[in-house]
Amino acid sequence: MRISRRTRTSRTAAAGLAAAAAVLTLVPATAAQAAPAAAAAPVAAAAPAPVSAAASTSAPGGNAAILGIDYGTWQREVAAIVDAARPAIEQRIAASPAGEKPALVLDIDNTSLETDFHWFWTYPTPAISKVRALTQYAHARGVAIFFVTARPGIIESLTEYNLKAVGYPVSGLYVRSLPDLFDEVSEYKTSKRAEIEARGYTIIANIGNSPTDLVGGHAERTVKLPDYGGKLS
């Protein structure tokens, strides 16, 4: 099934607005939820599969469950892709010359957060542990972490809170303001990466789950996570 860029944009905006409405009643209770589930540590040490199939074969909820996307399969595919990309990123970080300002750029929904695998009232939305671990590793070594999302500006503060609450370092967050809504998502995201470069940063990797997150250049390498033909936002 192919989903147009306009449909994807509308779905992202609608989901964001729904989340904003739900959070107004849920924010007082978020403190107890802020710590992410401790899944990352056993993953690296466990047997071959990075995620237990018995524990994760079905999604907790959300659009992914409605569409029949298997949660455990998705987690394993994401883990395999990030694990394959990480050595080159680590080497690039280690080779950064003095004075360089390296940066990672990430999409948010189903790239940094498990957005489509939880109902919109789940707040904060859990992090994707492998991606979070990569950003924490990079940030600890002087790499700036930028998020470029098609989410509307009305939920910028809620989005930033969510990212920080689940453990992401945030050097900058780009959301779609009113003028940006007239651009295709790919054009908007490309322009924001160009802005980051104009600030003196070198984008060593751009991570996303949709082609619209990755096309347009302005990054040394791209890392493509699964979107199952556009089923995931």
Where would I find each of the regions flagged by the language model?
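C-terminal cap/substrate-recognition subdomain and adjoining C-terminal extension
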Residues: 51-55, 156-233
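Sec-exported extracytoplasmic/periplasmic mature domains
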Residues: 90, 94, 136-143, 153, ...
